[in-house]
Amino acid sequence: MDSFSLLAALFFISAATWFISSRRRRNLPPGPFPYPIVGNMLQLGAQPHETFAKLSKKYGPLMSVHLGSLYTVIVSSPEMAKEIMLKYGTVFSGRTVAQAVHACDHDKISMGFLPIGAEWRDMRKICKEQMFSHQSMEDSQGLRKQKLQQLLDHAHRCSEQGRAIDIREAAFITTLNLMSATLFSMQATEFDSKVTMEFKEIIEGVASIVGVPNFADYFPILRPFDPQGVKRRADVYFGRLLALIEGYLNDRIQSRKANPDAPKKDDFLETLVDILNSNDNKLKTDHLLHLMLDLFVGGSETSTTEIEWIMEELVAHPDKMAKVKAELKSVMGDEKVVDESLMPRLPYLQAVVKESMRLHPPGPLLLPRKAESDQVVNGYLIPKGTQVLINAWAMGRDSTIWNNPDAFQPERFLDNKIDFKGQDYELIPFGSGRRVCPGMPLANRMLHTVTATLVHNFDWKLERPDAPLAEHQGVLFGFAVRRAVPLRIVPYKA
């Protein structure tokens, strides 16, 4: 053995000995042995959430991994998730911030990444009590129904022409239309208007950058060099989206000044203008602009992904599709666009959405958390600064929680009261605790109404009947986990 090989072997043995003794001494959660420099990154594969789920069966629901130089604990059970998100929610309220999120100082202004403090509480209060309150949702329902009608008209045109619909594309445009109507009262007369497509292009750009693996996130020493150009590209897309949103806000402010006696619109923009004009307001315009950015990027990408999964599962399971159609027919009759007030009378539709969220949480590892101080959980030490990932995908596929967990069986939710609103830790696609997704009330309504509109008015078939579905084609891990190949299905009247 030459001297270099001997030195390398001695280094590896020394590092391994130090690592093992250090872990035992500090009683860290168990986990796979990390390689020098790269840690466990080479073990992750294309679907990290699936890899973590498999490893957790060996190492347990609290598991240590090293992602480059970033020490991380993976949480894979409802019991441990509740400990992290509820019992020790204050300790684990911090965020690990990806380099892309530093674009336009988003990490310093966004409610999603701000530390828990006065600014965060003020923004959270605005979301809960004003923007996403039940009354606010009710007031803006009419605007969303108009956008659902545009989706229906688009599907009718495709049906008449025998043309397939790219469900991801249609869901993305519809979600943007629903959100822009709710936020801005945008009155675009076309399904795929120029403004909507501009939003789409920018948001897809943001999502592609935020979702791409970035070496600088795992090796912070590289951040000043931005080797993959992630920060530079993120600055461009974040800047464009913020400028677009600011334009709408300024237009509304000027309109209010020019016509102070004009009736107010039932949208979020009116709420934001009122907040800015309030004497006791402590927030700046930038806080509200970045809040809107979070809503557009987070809401459109995740809702789009989930709608595509719902439609795939229903097309793949005609018996479940028939049950949803029968329920919608009995409740809606000849009405074409569902009213949001009918949702409590559609338990099977609700069960379908829950089952899809269980199998396909759009963000399978949720947004990363960070320990703000040392904390012992389940007998293991989680040191200050540790990144914590909640594997919602693993909990949704856990055979100790769910019977036949890989099967699409909405009926399982007809016999229990489990919901995805953050109280039942078996099903937490929107997170839980103080960091739960603030836009969940709007996302919940969009998922149900878009699905109902598509299913109630048409039968559906694959563009290529011989085409395999996603389980055989693979999925793409990124900002949201979606199909590798877009779902293309043909609407028709049976």
UniProtKB/Swiss-Prot annotation:
Tell me which EC number(s) this protein carries.
1.14.14.65, 1.14.14.60
Query: What cofactor requirement does the entry state?
Result: heme
Which top-level enzyme class is recorded in the Swiss-Prot or TrEMBL entry? oxidoreductase
| Catalytic activities | ferruginol + 2 reduced [NADPH--hemoprotein reductase] + 2 O2 = sugiol + 2 oxidized [NADPH--hemoprotein reductase] + 3 H2O + 2 H(+); ferruginol + reduced [NADPH--hemoprotein reductase] + O2 = 11-hydroxyferruginol + oxidized [NADPH--hemoprotein reductase] + H2O + H(+); 11-hydroxyferruginol + 2 reduced [NADPH--hemoprotein reductase] + 2 O2 = 11-hydroxysugiol + 2 oxidized [NADPH--hemoprotein reductase] + 3 H2O + 2 H(+)
Q: Name one GO molecular function term.
A: iron ion binding
Its UniProt pathway annotation is: Secondary metabolite biosynthesis; terpenoid biosynthesis
Record's protein name: Sugiol synthase
Species source reads Salvia miltiorrhiza
